[in-house]
C-alpha cells in the first residue's frame, strides 16, 4: 500500500482507494488522520484494501464495478465503516452514524441513502460464517453481482432462506444478540425509534411509505 502524507496548513483530506489498477493508495493531511477518534483513518485504509481486491483479481471482484449496471455501490462505504469499527469496537454504537442507522434500519441493506450507516449486517454474516467470510465475499464476488447476490451464491441459499436469515438478523439485532455486538450494544437496546405503521389486512402492520 502507498501512504501519502500531505502537509496542508489549512487543508483537510482523507482519501483511500488506489492507483493504476495496481495498488491501494492512502492520502492524508495531518489534521484529517485523528478525526472521529481515528475512525476516518481506519475507514480510508479499509477503502485501500477494497481497491486492492480489484487489483488482485482482474477487475472481476471487489465491487469496483457498479452492481447490476447501476450507479454507485453502497457496500463500499458500509464495509469501510465496519472495518473501522472492528479496530475500535467501543465506538460502533457511539458515533455520528448510529442514529442514522436506527432511523433507516427498515430500508434495504444495500440502500444508497444510509450508505454510511449500514455497518452491522457484516457482523451478522461473520457470526454465521466466520470472521474470514467478508474477505471471501469481496474476493469471490463476480461482476455484475451486488453483495446480496454474491452472499447467496457463496452460501448456497435460496430467496426464501435469505429472507429467513434477514428475519433472524433483525430479531437478534433487537437486543444485539450476537457475540461481536452484545457487550457494547447492551446500553442501546432501548434506543430504537418506532417508525410510522399502517394497519393492513389480516391484522398485519407495515411500515408507512412516509418513513
Identify the meaning behind each predicted range.
Residues 2, 45, 77, 117-119:
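Extracellular structured ligand-interaction cores
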Residues 31-36, 40, 70, 74, ...:
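Soluble non-cytosolic domains of exported or imported proteins
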Residues 64-112, 124:
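Post-HExxH zinc-binding segment in Zn-dependent metallohydrolases
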Residues 1-72, 90:
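Juxtacatalytic substrate-recognition/specificity segment
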Residues 56-59, 90-95, 128-136:
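Substrate-binding/catalytic groove segments of enzymes
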Residues 79, 83, 117-163:
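Extracytoplasmic, non-cytosolic globular domains
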Residues 144-211:
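Beta/coil-rich, acidic/histidine-enriched accessory regions frequently appended to metallopeptidases
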Residues 44-45, 49-53, 83-91, 126-129, ...:
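Sec/Tat-exported extracytoplasmic proteins
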Amino acid at each position: 500500500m502507498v501512504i501519502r502524507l500531505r502537509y496542508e496548513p489549512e487543508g483537510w483530506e482523507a482519501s483511500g482507494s488506489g492507483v493504476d489498477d495496481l495498488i491501494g493508495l492512502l492520502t492524508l493531511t495531518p489534521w484529517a488522520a485523528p478525526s472521529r477518534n481515528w475512525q476516518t483513518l481506519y475507514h480510508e485504509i479499509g477503502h485501500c484494501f477494497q481497491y486492492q481486491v480489484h487489483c488482485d483479481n482482474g477487475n472481476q471482484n471487489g465491487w469496483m464495478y457498479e452492481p447490476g449496471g447501476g450507479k454507485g455501490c453502497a457496500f463500499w462505504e458500509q464495509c469501510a465503516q465496519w472495518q473501522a469499527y472492528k479496530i475500535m469496537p467501543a465506538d460502533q454504537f457511539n458515533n455520528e452514524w448510529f442514529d442514522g442507522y436506527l432511523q433507516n434500519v427498515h430500508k434495504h441493506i444495500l440502500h444508497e441513502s444510509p450508505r454510511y450507516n449500514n455497518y452491522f449486517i457484516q457482523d451478522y454474516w461473520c457470526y454465521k460464517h466466520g470472521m474470514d467470510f467478508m474477505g471471501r465475499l469481496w474476493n469471490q464476488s463476480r461482476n455484475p453481482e451486488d453483495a446480496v447476490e454474491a452472499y447467496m451464491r457463496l452460501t448456497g441459499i435460496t430467496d426464501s432462506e435469505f429472507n429467513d436469515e434477514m428475519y433472524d438478523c433483525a430479531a437478534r439485532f433487537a437486543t444485539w444478540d450476537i457475540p461481536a455486538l452484545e457487550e457494547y450494544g447492551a446500553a442501546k437496546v432501548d434506543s430504537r425509534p418506532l417508525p410510522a405503521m399502517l394497519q393492513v389486512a389480516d391484522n398485519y402492520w407495515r411500515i408507512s411509505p412516509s418513513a
